[in-house]
Amino acid sequence: MACKNIRYIVSLLILVSLTFGARIKDIATIEGNRYNYLIGYGLVVGLKGTGDGKATQFTVQSLANMLRRMGIPVDPRRITVKNVAAVMVTAKVPPYAKAGMRFDVEVSSIGDAKSLEGGTLLMTPLRGPDGKVYAIAQGQVIVGGYEARGRGAAQVKNVPTVGRIPNGAILEKDLPFSADFKEVNIYLDEPDFTTAKNVQDVINRAFGKNIAKAVDSATIRVKIPEGYSPVDFLAKVENLEVSTSSVAKVVIDGRSGIVLLGGNVSIEPVAVAVGSLVVEIKERPEVVQPPPLSPGETKVVPRTEVKVKEEKKRLVQIKGTTVSELVDALNSIGATPREIIQVLQAIKSAGALKAKLEVL
Protein backbone atom coordinates (compact mmCIF):
# COMPACT_ATOMS: atom_id res chain seq x y z
CA MET A 1 0.00 0.00 0.00
CA ALA A 2 2.87 2.38 0.82
CA CYS A 3 4.43 1.83 -2.59
CA LYS A 4 1.17 2.65 -4.36
CA ASN A 5 0.86 5.88 -2.44
CA ILE A 6 4.30 6.97 -3.55
CA ARG A 7 3.48 6.18 -7.18
CA TYR A 8 0.30 8.29 -7.06
CA ILE A 9 2.16 11.24 -5.56
CA VAL A 10 4.77 11.10 -8.30
CA SER A 11 2.13 10.99 -11.04
CA LEU A 12 0.43 14.07 -9.61
CA LEU A 13 3.66 16.02 -9.54
CA ILE A 14 4.44 15.05 -13.11
CA LEU A 15 1.18 16.66 -14.20
CA VAL A 16 2.02 19.80 -12.28
CA SER A 17 5.46 20.05 -13.82
CA LEU A 18 3.94 19.95 -17.32
CA THR A 19 1.80 23.04 -16.71
CA PHE A 20 2.74 25.68 -19.30
CA GLY A 21 1.99 28.79 -17.28
CA ALA A 22 0.55 30.27 -14.13
CA ARG A 23 -0.99 33.56 -13.16
CA ILE A 24 1.29 35.98 -11.37
CA LYS A 25 -1.09 36.00 -8.39
CA ASP A 26 -0.59 32.21 -8.03
CA ILE A 27 3.21 32.31 -7.85
CA ALA A 28 3.91 35.67 -6.23
CA THR A 29 2.78 38.13 -3.58
CA ILE A 30 2.18 41.80 -4.29
CA GLU A 31 3.77 44.16 -1.77
CA GLY A 32 1.32 45.02 1.00
CA ASN A 33 -1.08 42.24 0.02
CA ARG A 34 -0.41 40.07 3.04
CA TYR A 35 -2.03 38.94 6.26
CA ASN A 36 -1.36 40.71 9.55
CA TYR A 37 -1.07 38.88 12.85
CA LEU A 38 -2.53 39.94 16.20
CA ILE A 39 -2.15 38.46 19.67
CA GLY A 40 -3.73 38.92 23.08
CA TYR A 41 -4.06 37.44 26.57
CA GLY A 42 -7.47 36.62 27.98
CA LEU A 43 -9.63 34.43 30.20
CA VAL A 44 -12.06 31.68 29.24
CA VAL A 45 -14.83 31.19 31.81
CA GLY A 46 -17.75 28.80 32.25
CA LEU A 47 -15.76 25.57 32.13
CA LYS A 48 -17.07 22.43 33.84
CA GLY A 49 -14.22 22.01 36.29
CA THR A 50 -11.66 21.62 33.50
CA GLY A 51 -9.95 24.97 34.00
CA ASP A 52 -6.58 25.85 35.52
CA GLY A 53 -5.52 24.60 38.92
CA LYS A 54 -4.50 26.60 41.97
CA ALA A 55 -0.84 26.27 40.98
CA THR A 56 -1.46 28.51 37.96
CA GLN A 57 -0.96 31.78 39.80
CA PHE A 58 -1.24 34.06 36.76
CA THR A 59 -4.82 32.85 36.19
CA VAL A 60 -5.75 33.61 39.79
CA GLN A 61 -4.10 37.04 39.62
CA SER A 62 -5.72 37.87 36.27
CA LEU A 63 -9.18 36.98 37.57
CA ALA A 64 -8.64 39.02 40.75
CA ASN A 65 -7.47 42.04 38.72
CA MET A 66 -10.49 41.80 36.40
CA LEU A 67 -12.94 41.65 39.30
CA ARG A 68 -11.18 44.57 40.98
CA ARG A 69 -11.60 46.70 37.84
CA MET A 70 -15.30 45.87 37.96
CA GLY A 71 -15.50 47.18 41.51
CA ILE A 72 -15.43 43.78 43.21
CA PRO A 73 -12.33 43.57 45.43
CA VAL A 74 -11.41 39.96 46.26
CA ASP A 75 -8.59 38.16 48.00
CA PRO A 76 -6.67 36.10 45.39
CA ARG A 77 -6.08 33.42 48.03
CA ARG A 78 -9.83 32.76 48.20
CA ILE A 79 -10.32 32.38 44.45
CA THR A 80 -10.84 28.95 42.88
CA VAL A 81 -10.15 28.90 39.16
CA LYS A 82 -11.21 25.39 38.15
CA ASN A 83 -13.88 26.92 35.90
CA VAL A 84 -11.49 29.52 34.42
CA ALA A 85 -8.53 29.12 32.04
CA ALA A 86 -5.87 31.60 30.98
CA VAL A 87 -5.43 31.62 27.21
CA MET A 88 -3.49 33.23 24.39
CA VAL A 89 -5.68 34.56 21.59
CA THR A 90 -4.20 34.76 18.10
CA ALA A 91 -5.68 36.01 14.84
CA LYS A 92 -4.77 36.42 11.18
CA VAL A 93 -6.28 39.61 9.75
CA PRO A 94 -6.93 39.77 5.98
CA PRO A 95 -5.02 42.40 3.98
CA TYR A 96 -6.58 45.87 3.75
CA ALA A 97 -9.04 45.08 6.56
CA LYS A 98 -11.17 48.02 7.68
CA ALA A 99 -12.72 48.97 11.01
CA GLY A 100 -15.84 46.94 11.76
CA MET A 101 -14.68 43.85 9.86
CA ARG A 102 -15.02 40.54 11.73
CA PHE A 103 -12.59 37.62 11.59
CA ASP A 104 -11.88 34.30 13.32
CA VAL A 105 -9.60 33.90 16.33
CA GLU A 106 -7.82 30.89 17.82
CA VAL A 107 -7.78 30.34 21.57
CA SER A 108 -5.01 28.25 23.21
CA SER A 109 -4.61 27.37 26.89
CA ILE A 110 -1.33 28.42 28.52
CA GLY A 111 -2.01 26.95 31.97
CA ASP A 112 -2.85 23.42 33.09
CA ALA A 113 -6.49 23.42 31.98
CA LYS A 114 -7.83 20.06 30.81
CA SER A 115 -10.33 21.37 28.26
CA LEU A 116 -11.82 24.61 26.92
CA GLU A 117 -15.06 22.91 25.86
CA GLY A 118 -18.14 24.95 26.71
CA GLY A 119 -16.13 28.02 27.72
CA THR A 120 -16.60 31.67 26.79
CA LEU A 121 -13.75 34.04 26.04
CA LEU A 122 -14.15 37.35 27.85
CA MET A 123 -13.40 40.63 26.09
CA THR A 124 -9.75 40.45 25.04
CA PRO A 125 -7.77 43.23 23.31
CA LEU A 126 -5.66 42.05 20.36
CA ARG A 127 -2.40 43.87 19.67
CA GLY A 128 -0.11 44.11 16.68
CA PRO A 129 3.71 43.96 16.62
CA ASP A 130 3.77 47.69 17.43
CA GLY A 131 1.93 47.07 20.72
CA LYS A 132 -1.19 48.97 19.65
CA VAL A 133 -4.69 47.51 20.10
CA TYR A 134 -6.35 46.85 16.73
CA ALA A 135 -9.19 44.47 17.60
CA ILE A 136 -11.34 43.06 20.41
CA ALA A 137 -12.19 39.35 20.71
CA GLN A 138 -15.00 37.71 22.66
CA GLY A 139 -17.37 34.77 22.26
CA GLN A 140 -18.13 31.07 22.67
CA VAL A 141 -15.14 28.79 22.16
CA ILE A 142 -15.65 25.87 19.76
CA VAL A 143 -13.37 22.92 20.51
CA GLY A 144 -12.70 20.10 18.06
CA GLY A 145 -11.72 17.58 20.73
CA TYR A 146 -12.99 16.35 24.07
CA GLU A 147 -11.84 14.84 27.34
CA ALA A 148 -13.87 12.38 29.42
CA ARG A 149 -12.33 11.66 32.83
CA GLY A 150 -13.27 9.42 35.71
CA ARG A 151 -11.52 8.38 38.90
CA GLY A 152 -9.60 5.57 37.31
CA ALA A 153 -9.43 6.39 33.62
CA ALA A 154 -9.63 9.17 31.07
CA GLN A 155 -10.21 9.39 27.34
CA VAL A 156 -9.00 12.31 25.23
CA LYS A 157 -9.63 12.95 21.54
CA ASN A 158 -7.71 15.53 19.50
CA VAL A 159 -6.62 18.64 21.46
CA PRO A 160 -9.39 20.00 23.74
CA THR A 161 -7.16 22.82 25.02
CA VAL A 162 -7.25 24.66 21.68
CA GLY A 163 -10.39 26.12 20.12
CA ARG A 164 -11.71 28.69 17.66
CA ILE A 165 -14.27 31.48 17.73
CA PRO A 166 -15.72 32.06 14.24
CA ASN A 167 -16.02 35.80 13.61
CA GLY A 168 -15.04 36.22 17.23
CA ALA A 169 -13.04 39.43 16.78
CA ILE A 170 -13.96 42.83 15.43
CA LEU A 171 -11.43 45.27 14.03
CA GLU A 172 -11.54 48.57 15.91
CA LYS A 173 -9.43 50.60 13.48
CA ASP A 174 -8.01 50.33 9.99
CA LEU A 175 -4.65 48.68 9.54
CA PRO A 176 -1.90 51.03 8.28
CA PHE A 177 -1.98 51.22 4.46
CA SER A 178 -1.30 53.85 1.83
CA ALA A 179 -3.08 53.59 -1.54
CA ASP A 180 -1.14 56.51 -3.03
CA PHE A 181 2.01 54.94 -4.47
CA LYS A 182 3.77 55.14 -7.82
CA GLU A 183 5.55 51.79 -7.83
CA VAL A 184 5.10 48.39 -6.26
CA ASN A 185 7.22 45.31 -5.64
CA ILE A 186 6.19 41.80 -6.62
CA TYR A 187 7.78 39.00 -4.57
CA LEU A 188 8.03 35.47 -5.97
CA ASP A 189 6.97 32.73 -3.56
CA GLU A 190 9.81 30.54 -4.89
CA PRO A 191 12.80 32.73 -5.84
CA ASP A 192 14.12 31.91 -9.31
CA PHE A 193 16.05 34.13 -11.74
CA THR A 194 14.39 32.63 -14.82
CA THR A 195 10.87 33.10 -13.47
CA ALA A 196 11.70 36.64 -12.29
CA LYS A 197 12.85 37.60 -15.80
CA ASN A 198 9.76 35.98 -17.32
CA VAL A 199 7.51 38.05 -15.03
CA GLN A 200 9.41 41.20 -16.01
CA ASP A 201 9.04 40.47 -19.74
CA VAL A 202 5.34 39.56 -19.50
CA ILE A 203 4.46 42.81 -17.71
CA ASN A 204 6.49 44.94 -20.12
CA ARG A 205 4.85 43.29 -23.14
CA ALA A 206 1.35 43.65 -21.68
CA PHE A 207 1.70 47.42 -21.19
CA GLY A 208 4.03 48.15 -24.09
CA LYS A 209 6.64 49.90 -21.94
CA ASN A 210 9.60 49.04 -19.74
CA ILE A 211 7.83 49.53 -16.43
CA ALA A 212 8.98 46.27 -14.78
CA LYS A 213 12.51 45.37 -13.73
CA ALA A 214 13.69 42.18 -12.05
CA VAL A 215 15.86 43.34 -9.14
CA ASP A 216 16.91 39.86 -8.00
CA SER A 217 15.65 36.27 -8.07
CA ALA A 218 12.66 37.12 -5.86
CA THR A 219 11.77 40.77 -6.52
CA ILE A 220 10.28 42.50 -9.55
CA ARG A 221 9.89 46.27 -9.17
CA VAL A 222 7.03 47.72 -11.22
CA LYS A 223 6.19 51.38 -11.89
CA ILE A 224 2.50 52.20 -12.22
CA PRO A 225 2.01 53.86 -15.63
CA GLU A 226 0.08 57.08 -16.06
CA GLY A 227 -3.64 56.70 -16.55
CA TYR A 228 -3.91 53.72 -14.20
CA SER A 229 -5.06 53.69 -10.60
CA PRO A 230 -3.16 51.25 -8.34
CA VAL A 231 -6.23 48.98 -8.09
CA ASP A 232 -6.88 48.82 -11.85
CA PHE A 233 -3.22 48.29 -12.63
CA LEU A 234 -2.62 45.53 -10.07
CA ALA A 235 -5.86 43.77 -11.04
CA LYS A 236 -4.52 43.44 -14.58
CA VAL A 237 -0.98 42.53 -13.53
CA GLU A 238 -1.92 39.72 -11.14
CA ASN A 239 -3.94 37.93 -13.84
CA LEU A 240 -1.14 37.91 -16.43
CA GLU A 241 0.11 34.41 -17.25
CA VAL A 242 3.81 33.67 -17.05
CA SER A 243 5.84 30.55 -17.77
CA THR A 244 7.58 29.23 -14.68
CA SER A 245 10.89 27.46 -14.26
CA SER A 246 10.63 24.68 -11.70
CA VAL A 247 13.66 23.38 -9.81
CA ALA A 248 14.29 19.64 -9.73
CA LYS A 249 13.70 18.71 -6.12
CA VAL A 250 13.05 15.65 -3.97
CA VAL A 251 11.30 16.30 -0.65
CA ILE A 252 11.46 13.70 2.13
CA ASP A 253 9.42 13.72 5.34
CA GLY A 254 11.43 11.50 7.65
CA ARG A 255 8.72 11.37 10.32
CA SER A 256 5.89 10.12 8.14
CA GLY A 257 7.92 8.34 5.48
CA ILE A 258 6.42 10.39 2.64
CA VAL A 259 8.61 11.01 -0.41
CA LEU A 260 7.67 13.65 -3.00
CA LEU A 261 9.50 13.63 -6.32
CA GLY A 262 9.03 16.06 -9.20
CA GLY A 263 8.68 14.72 -12.70
CA ASN A 264 11.73 16.65 -13.92
CA VAL A 265 14.14 14.84 -11.59
CA SER A 266 17.02 13.29 -13.53
CA ILE A 267 18.74 10.13 -12.30
CA GLU A 268 21.89 8.59 -13.73
CA PRO A 269 22.34 4.80 -13.97
CA VAL A 270 23.05 3.39 -10.52
CA ALA A 271 22.93 0.05 -8.66
CA VAL A 272 21.07 -0.08 -5.35
CA ALA A 273 21.37 -2.75 -2.65
CA VAL A 274 18.73 -2.80 0.05
CA GLY A 275 19.06 -4.94 3.15
CA SER A 276 18.36 -4.76 6.84
CA LEU A 277 19.44 -6.29 10.12
CA VAL A 278 16.71 -6.63 12.74
CA VAL A 279 17.71 -7.17 16.37
CA GLU A 280 14.92 -7.88 18.86
CA ILE A 281 15.61 -8.09 22.59
CA LYS A 282 12.82 -9.00 25.02
CA GLU A 283 13.11 -8.86 28.79
CA ARG A 284 10.65 -11.10 30.65
CA PRO A 285 11.32 -11.04 34.39
CA GLU A 286 10.16 -14.26 36.10
CA VAL A 287 9.16 -14.41 39.75
CA VAL A 288 10.51 -17.52 41.57
CA GLN A 289 8.74 -18.54 44.78
CA PRO A 290 10.44 -20.67 47.46
CA PRO A 291 8.76 -23.90 48.61
CA PRO A 292 6.09 -23.47 51.32
CA LEU A 293 7.43 -23.09 54.89
CA SER A 294 11.02 -22.92 53.64
CA PRO A 295 13.47 -20.16 54.73
CA GLY A 296 13.98 -19.07 51.11
CA GLU A 297 13.05 -15.66 49.68
CA THR A 298 11.04 -14.65 46.65
CA LYS A 299 13.36 -13.67 43.82
CA VAL A 300 12.92 -12.05 40.43
CA VAL A 301 14.99 -13.88 37.83
CA PRO A 302 15.64 -12.07 34.52
CA ARG A 303 14.76 -13.97 31.37
CA THR A 304 16.24 -12.43 28.23
CA GLU A 305 15.32 -13.48 24.71
CA VAL A 306 17.47 -12.23 21.84
CA LYS A 307 16.51 -12.65 18.18
CA VAL A 308 18.63 -11.50 15.26
CA LYS A 309 17.21 -11.60 11.75
CA GLU A 310 19.22 -10.54 8.73
CA GLU A 311 17.36 -10.11 5.48
CA LYS A 312 19.14 -10.87 2.26
CA LYS A 313 20.24 -7.84 0.29
CA ARG A 314 18.26 -7.10 -2.82
CA LEU A 315 20.26 -5.62 -5.68
CA VAL A 316 18.64 -3.70 -8.51
CA GLN A 317 20.22 -1.66 -11.27
CA ILE A 318 18.35 1.52 -12.20
CA LYS A 319 18.89 2.25 -15.87
CA GLY A 320 16.06 4.70 -16.49
CA THR A 321 16.26 8.42 -15.99
CA THR A 322 12.63 9.19 -15.11
CA VAL A 323 10.92 9.37 -11.76
CA SER A 324 8.38 6.69 -12.62
CA GLU A 325 11.15 4.25 -13.57
CA LEU A 326 12.97 4.97 -10.31
CA VAL A 327 9.85 4.31 -8.23
CA ASP A 328 8.99 1.17 -10.20
CA ALA A 329 12.53 -0.13 -9.69
CA LEU A 330 12.41 0.48 -5.93
CA ASN A 331 8.95 -1.06 -5.69
CA SER A 332 10.13 -4.12 -7.62
CA ILE A 333 12.58 -4.99 -4.85
CA GLY A 334 9.91 -4.49 -2.19
CA ALA A 335 11.48 -1.41 -0.66
CA THR A 336 9.55 0.20 2.19
CA PRO A 337 9.11 4.01 2.41
CA ARG A 338 11.90 4.13 5.01
CA GLU A 339 14.21 2.20 2.72
CA ILE A 340 13.30 4.46 -0.21
CA ILE A 341 14.35 7.46 1.89
CA GLN A 342 17.70 5.82 2.64
CA VAL A 343 18.15 4.89 -1.02
CA LEU A 344 17.48 8.44 -2.20
CA GLN A 345 19.96 9.84 0.31
CA ALA A 346 22.56 7.32 -0.85
CA ILE A 347 21.91 8.08 -4.54
CA LYS A 348 22.30 11.79 -3.83
CA SER A 349 25.59 11.16 -1.99
CA ALA A 350 26.81 9.12 -4.96
CA GLY A 351 26.05 12.01 -7.30
CA ALA A 352 23.49 10.07 -9.33
CA LEU A 353 20.46 12.12 -8.26
CA LYS A 354 20.42 15.36 -10.25
CA ALA A 355 18.08 17.25 -7.97
CA LYS A 356 18.00 19.09 -4.68
CA LEU A 357 17.29 16.80 -1.74
CA GLU A 358 15.25 18.39 1.05
CA VAL A 359 14.62 16.51 4.31
CA LEU A 360 11.81 17.83 6.51
From Swiss-Prot:
Keyword Signal: yes
Keywords associated with the record: Bacterial flagellum, Periplasm, Signal
Cited InterPro entries: Flag_FlgI
Pfam families: FlgI
Recorded GO CC terms: bacterial-type flagellum basal body, distal rod, P ring; outer membrane-bounded periplasmic space
Origin: domain of life: Bacteria
Signal peptide: 1-22
Location(s), subcellular: Periplasm; Bacterial flagellum basal body
Gene Ontology terms for molecular function: structural molecule activity
GO biological process: bacterial-type flagellum-dependent cell motility
Function, as annotated: Assembles around the rod to form the L-ring and probably protects the motor/basal body from shearing forces during rotation.
HAMAP family in the cross-refs: FlgI
Family the entry assigns: Belongs to the FlgI family.
Record note on quaternary structure: The basal body constitutes a major portion of the flagellar organelle and consists of four rings (L,P,S, and M) mounted on a central rod.
NCBIfam families cross-referenced by the UniProt entry: PRK05303.1 (NF003676)
Identification of the protein by name: Flagellar P-ring protein
Organism in which the protein naturally occurs: Aquifex aeolicus (strain VF5)
